Amino acid sequence: MSQIKLIVGLANSGTKYEDTRHNAGEWLINEIARQFNVSLKEEAKFFGKVAKINAAGGEVRLLVPTTFMNLSGKAVGALANFYRIKPEEILVAHDELDLPPGVAKIKQGGGHGGHNGLKDIIASLGNSNNFYRVRIGIGHPGSKELVAGYVLGKPSPQDQEKINAAVDEAGRCVDLLLKDGITKATNRLNAFKA
């Protein structure tokens, strides 16, 4: 099992986006930063906000790209190259249309499912999709045409409550992952439903 060395939370930068569904990945990074009592700081050379936590297996970097979502790979690629972090040592948290609110799942590899942030990260890692993901369920609007507006919209209070519960549990599972490995964390998170 690879030791995770970089955890990325995908988001659009700027206050008008911070409460939108597409920023669910950043919500998880904020939760992990809170657990480890660190603050993310803007780092221009990594095109994002960065923090360092000390976990059982060594240093782990947290990253929220401050590029637009579809340029997330620029930040991930810059940081991964600088610290020589391999794709399988990266965990990317992102919003997931194919899971309902209140559910989050860990998986390795797979396509980008139309997610432009994931698409750009795969390209920036030399077309490797071998990184791990935490897929945070946001639900689906029902029709493809509605997706763009939906991901940039805010969840209903009921959905937000469920997403928050899944993000909290995902935060606990990331802590477990850093201590006990990916399998235990995956089994626990993938069984959770708010």
Curated annotation (Swiss-Prot):
Catalytic reaction annotation: an N-acyl-L-alpha-aminoacyl-tRNA + H2O = an N-acyl-L-amino acid + a tRNA + H(+)
Residues the UniProt record annotates as site (Discriminates between blocked and unblocked aminoacyl-tRNA): N12
| Gene Ontology MF annotations | peptidyl-tRNA hydrolase activity; tRNA binding
Q: What class of enzyme is it?
A: hydrolase
Residue stretches spanning the membrane:
none
Which residues bear the site annotation Stabilizes the basic form of H active site to accept a proton? D95
Q: Which residues form the active site?
A: H22
E.C. no: 3.1.1.29
Question: What are the alphabetically sorted keywords of the record?
Answer: Cytoplasm, Hydrolase, RNA-binding, tRNA-binding
A Pfam entry, by short name: Pept_tRNA_hydro
Biological-process GO terms, alphabetical: protein quality control for misfolded or incompletely synthesized proteins; rescue of stalled ribosome
> Can you say where in the cell this protein is located?
Cytoplasm
Q: Which residues bind tRNA?
A: Y17, F68, N70, N116
What do the Gene Ontology cellular component annotations say?
Answer: cytoplasm
- Function as written in the Swiss-Prot or TrEMBL entry: Hydrolyzes ribosome-free peptidyl-tRNAs (with 1 or more amino acids incorporated), which drop off the ribosome during protein synthesis, or as a result of ribosome stalling. Catalyzes the release of premature peptidyl moieties from peptidyl-tRNA molecules trapped in stalled 50S ribosomal subunits, and thus maintains levels of free tRNAs and 50S ribosomes.
Question: What assembly does the database describe for this protein?
Answer: Monomer.
The entry's family comment says: Belongs to the PTH family.
Question: Do you know which PANTHER family this protein is assigned to?
Answer: PEPTIDYL-TRNA HYDROLASE (PTHR17224:SF1)
Q: Could you identify this protein by its name?
A: Peptidyl-tRNA hydrolase
Organism of this sequence? Actinobacillus pleuropneumoniae serotype 3 (strain JL03)
Q: Which gene encodes it?
A: pth
